[in-house]
């Protein structure tokens, strides 16, 4: 379960930390409230391709992290063991991206590649998007 996400110098966000309560989480809000930025940061932490243009203007790098509770997460533990990632009941994912198109990824302090991050990310969280479109009808 996602407990906390921290975002620094990503898109418009200088620095923000959000804590999540146990259970189902829904993000909703007005246009421009930051839902897409939050989901973009979460996507990077789960293995999405880095978009280096998302580094906040005037900064050299963005740093993102997420803390997951592994208490009820049985499927990810064997994968972490296979990848030689030490863990107890929590997993800290950190990712740094810089303007030189470099990305550094850490799982509980151990450097990993994007493929390992994607494999772990698939076991941690499900993100569902709902896109609503307004259709304009014209009478001729």
Show where each model-derived region lies.
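Gly/Lys-enriched N-terminal cap/neck module of very large, oligomeric protein machines
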Residues: 4-138
């Amino acid at each position: 379960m996602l407990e906390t996400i921290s975002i620094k110098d990503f898109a418009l966000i200088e620095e923000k930390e959000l804590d999540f309560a146990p259970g189902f989480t829904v993000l909703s809000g007005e246009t421009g409230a930051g839902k897409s930025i939050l989901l973009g940061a979460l996507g990077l932490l789960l293995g999405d391709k880095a978009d280096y243009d998302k580094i906040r203007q005037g900064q050299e790098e963005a740093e993102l992290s997420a803390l997951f509770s592994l208490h009820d997460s049985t499927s990810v533990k064997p994968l972490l063991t296979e990848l030689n990632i030490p863990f107890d009941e929590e997993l800290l994912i950190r990712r740094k991206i810089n303007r030189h198109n470099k990305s550094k990824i850490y799982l509980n302090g151990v450097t990993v590649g994007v493929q390992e991050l994607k494999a772990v990310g698939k076991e941690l969280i499900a993100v569902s998007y709902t896109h609503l479109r307004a259709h304009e009808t014209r009478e001729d």
